[in-house]
Amino acid sequence: MISNYPGSEEAKVALQDLKSVYIELNDINSFAAYANSLGGNVRFEVSEQDSLTYLAAEKLFMRGDNEGARRSLTNYLQTFPQGAFSSNANFYLASIAFAKKDLEEAKRLFSLVLESGDTKFREESWARKAEIEYLDKDYAAAMESFKHLQAVAENPENKEAAKLGLMRCAELTGQPQEALLAANNLLKEPKLSPEIMSEARYVRAKAYISLKQENKALADLKEISKDTRTIHGAEAKYLLAQLYYDNKDDKNAETVLMNFIENGTPHQYWLARGFILLADIYIRQGDDFQARQYLTSLQNNYKGDDEIAAMIEDRLGKLKK
């Protein structure tokens, strides 16, 4: 039909049907070769070949055929390196690499999407790039990416992720002022989970302590330390007692530590630090017997492989003098 009656309406319809078949087969190149061989008024323009080659590959991606999509998208980019859909293709290839945990390749491709200036996938590309850099422990780079994400994010989840990422990176890179600002910014979010809210208050309290503004940390420490089942709650309990101790408020420090011991925690390191601080309180009060009792008990029962043993030895050594 197509070759026998090339100018007829029937031939045009048949050619369109044939094109659909080749799209489904993901073989646009063969269709292009055939169409261009017909001569006459039949021309398969490069722009249409660009579009259809991409659409065939995109269909595979949308169906969940990641391996087929990867091959087809790669072929598209090789055939049309400056194609109209190169940014889309790079984004989908990046998503496939990310799903396969090929993070280095995913970051390279997400970066290409961002460099293209195409805004369609900008938000998700910044989100994934920041996540990859964070997972790679490249916190300085991740911090910059989270800043970009915060500036462009419209999705509520990405907005929260940007603020959370900024806060964590600031803390991990030893920037208490930045961490404080980021924590305050995150705490303005209306629908934070209890875990994230607790983490933000913990980071804020630690930032205040680093900035020598300990009194401002008290409210957060008191709130977080209500639940010593969490790692942040256990550390906050110890830090609260330490702040009281540093301010010569032995009574409140002892009360906090006794409550800590009574309620317990799965985080034995911070409980051990609490016992040592309690011994320090008794040493300062001249009650060496009580201090020695706590230290000896801790020495006999603590199983951790960290600096606790040395801290106990140091204090017991001083008590013998």
Go through the PLM ranges and name each one:
Residues 1-321:
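Acidic, polar-rich low-complexity tracts and alpha-helical solenoid repeat scaffolds
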